[in-house]
Amino acid sequence: MNSPEKLELLNQLLKHAKCAPFYQNRLPKNPLSSWDELKSIPLTTKEDLRRESPFGLIAVPRLELYQYHESFGTTGVPVSVWLTRDDYLAHAWEIGQWGVDFRSNDVVMVRFPYSISAAAHMVQSAAQWKQSCVIAAGARSSVSPASRIVTMLQKLEVTVLTCLPLQVLLIAEAAEMLGFKPSRDFPHLRVIGTAGEPLSISRRRMLEEIWGVPILDHYGMTEIGAAIMDCCYGQPHPLEDYFVFELLKDDFQTNAEEGEIGNLVVTPLYRLGTPMIRFVTGDRARYMNQQCRCGKNHILQIRGRKEHTITVGDRIFDIWDLEEIISHLPCRRFWAVGPLEQGLHFVVEQEKEDSGITQQLVEELKSRYSMDLKFEVLPKGTLYDRSDLLNVANVGKPEYIYTAQEMAEKAYAKSTKI
C-alpha cells in the first residue's frame, strides 16, 4: 500500500539520493505532495547505470562503503552497486522474510555464485542471522561440481538448498547418475530456495516432483536487493514496506490493470550507498489482489524479461506460457523453443526410452492452444552435457619444493595449479 507514511519515506530517500552525482539535477527540488507526482521523476534504466558506473551513483562518503557487487547484462558491461553496512543488513533482513524460514538447527547450502554477484552473500547473511549453519558451495566453481554437491547434501545432512532453478535440476541429474533418487535419498532436506530466473508454476511443480520437497522462490536483483518473497505456500508477495513497486504499460506512463502483465519498476526505500529511483527492472510482472493462506493479500508474479518472449501472430508467449505447454509432455526437463510462421517449434531432450511424443498428444496440444506446434525429441545430452556434472577439477596449494627424483622427472611442469 502506498500510504502517506510511505510517501514521507520516499521523500527522505529522494533528498538523500541527490548526494549522488547522477541524481543531483534529476530529482524534484521540493518533496512530492502526492503519489501521482511520482511519475514526474525520470525512470532510471540499465543504460543510465552502465554510463554512470562505477562512481556516479554513490550517495555516501567513500568511507561509509561496506561491500561492492556488479550486475552483468547481455551487453557484458557491468553495473556497479556499492552498499553501506546498513544496506547490507537490510538485504539480509529482506531475505529473512523468505518462506524458506531459516532456523537455528538448519544446515543451509548456498549454491548461488559468490564471485561479484550479490545473491549468495545475502542468503548467507540471512541464514546466519537466523542462527543457521551455512555451507558456502558457490556455483560456477571448478572445485564444487554437481557431484560434490550431491555428496555433501547427503554426508552433511543439509536441510536447506538454495540455488538457481536450473541448478536444482542439474543437481538432481547428477544425483541420478550416481544412483540416487532425489525424493528418497536426501531425508534431511526439507525445502529448496531458488532465485535468479523466473520460476513458473509448471516448472515449480516438476522440481517438487523430482525432489519431494517444497520449492520456494524469491525475486531480486543486484541493483535493488530482494524485493519479492515466496511465502511458505509458494505465493510471491512484494515487500511493500521496503520498496515502491510500479507496474506500467509499454508506454511507461500508464499503470497496468490488476491481473494485466506490465513492466516492473522498483524503488528501494532504504538503499543508501547507491540509490535506485524508479529503476526499470526489464522484467514483466502481474499484480493480483487476492487473499493468501499466509494472511497477505498482494501477489506479484514475475513473468520474465520482455526480450525472452516469442510472438506468434498477436499472441505473446513468455516463459510461463511456454513451460505450461512443456508440462504436458513426457520429457520436460531440458528444452528449447523457436517460432514457426503460425506456431512454435520445441526441441526437448529424451529422458527415458519410452518418453517419445505421440502424434495424438501433438494434435491434442494443437487444439488446446489453437496454433501449430512442432516437437523434436533429441538424444539425452544434446542440450546439456551431463559429463561436466561429475568432473572435479584438480586444484591445490602452490608447490615449490621437490625431491631430486621429482626434479629429474620435471614434476614441477605438471604440478597442481590454484
Report each predicted region and the residues it spans.
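Active-site phosphate/ATP/adenylate-binding loop shared across adenylate-forming ligases
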Residues: 47-188, 198-206, 210, 234
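Conserved AMP-binding/adenylate-forming
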Residues: 199, 203-291
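Nucleotide 5′-phosphate-binding alpha/beta core
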Residues: 1-93, 97-98, 104, 155, ...
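Residue-level signal for inorganic ion chemistry
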Residues: 16-17, 71, 161, 220, ...
